[in-house]
Design a protein with these regions (language model features):
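Catalytic cores of RNA-modifying enzymes
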Residues: 2-237, 280-286, 290-291
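An accessory alpha-helical subdomain
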Residues: 208-217, 223-257, 265, 270-276
Length: 291
């Protein structure tokens, strides 16, 4: 069968969002003589209903400015472009750039870079950016935290991640997945698991179930940089020994006065404290250390 350019076959009809089918993906990969890289977590979305769901949950509109991390071959990107939004994509795999360029046909800015090292001030200047990403398990939580800490221009995110990672990002006090990651995310944003994505919508099919996590940045920070850094220090030490009571896990870095001043009980364990309590504890510990 003769190759028909992707751009000649992808149109938006009756409100249906454009996307790449599994046939499109296989043909593009075969044409380039490449295969999905497991090391990069390359599982391409090939289900139009999933693409539509992601765009809807991300609340992308015609006046949105969107960064997509890990566009792959551009299936979701096409749907983002179709909304009329301004779209930039960051792809780390150089082998996909020519294919992505063909598929998108000038509809989005393509940046060949690693999202962990890209110049975000150039990529997403100012305020009010949305971010959509399909993140590999090994970088998902660290990248979400890095974006919240260091890229204030991104107001909202919708990330597709392995279920276990998504549960950690969005966990609240009392949830089994609640940990240091949950606290650090809650410091700067509200995170909610808003959907599940089965393996069947990807090519190739992963062995895990993914979830969609919506992350909306708080309008104001609740602490100074100094208190935040102290909280992170306490989180790392306490959650590294999460089954121990705080008076044991934080021996040498806190004092009885820190507990008294903050109202935190020495017998509590780290997963019992929400982000506001952690901030109060960190602030008290700093005050005692300086006195």
């Amino acid at each position: 069968m003769a190759w028909v350019p992707i751009k000649a076959r992808l149109v938006s009809l009756a409100g249906d969002l454009v996307s790449l089918s599994i046939t499109d993906v296989k043909r593009l990969l075969d044409k380039a003589g490449i295969a999905p890289k497991k090391s990069l977590g390359q599982n391409f979305v090939v289900d139009p209903n999933t693409v539509k769901k992601i765009v809807r949950l991300a609340q992308i509109k015609s006046n949105s400015r969107v960064v997509e991390i890990g566009p792959g071959l551009g299936s979701l990107t096409l749907a983002l472009i179709d909304t009329g939004a301004e779209v930039s994509v960051v792809e780390t795999d150089g082998a996909l750039i020519p294919l992505l360029t063909e598929v998108l046909n000038g509809g989005a800015r393509i940046v060949h870079a690693d999202a962990r090292t890209v110049d975000w001030q150039d990529l997403a200047p100012g305020k009010g950016w949305d971010l959509v990403a399909n993140l590999p398990y090994n970088i998902a939580t660290s990248l979400v935290i890095e974006l919240l800490d260091e890229v204030p221009s991104v107001d909202r995110m919708l990330v597709m991640v392995q279920r276990e990672a998504g549960e950690r990002i969005a966990a609240k006090v009392g949830d089994s997945a609640y940990g240091a990651v949950s606290v650090r995310v809650a410091l700067r944003a509200k995170a909610t698991v808003v959907g599940s994505v089965p393996p069947s919508v990807f090519y190739p099919k992963p062995r895990v179930t993914s979830v969609l996590v919506a992350v909306e940045r708080h309008k104001q920070m609740e602490s100074s940089n100094e208190v935040t850094e102290e909280m992170i220090r306490l989180l790392r030490q306490s959650f590294g020994q999460r089954r121990k009571m705080l008076r044991k896990s934080l021996t040498g870095v806190t004092t009885p006065e820190s507990f008294t001043l903050s109202g935190v009980k020495p017998s509590q364990r780290p997963e019992e404290l929400d982000v506001k309590t952690w901030l109060r504890f960190a602030e008290a510990n700093l005050k005692v250390r300086k006195s």
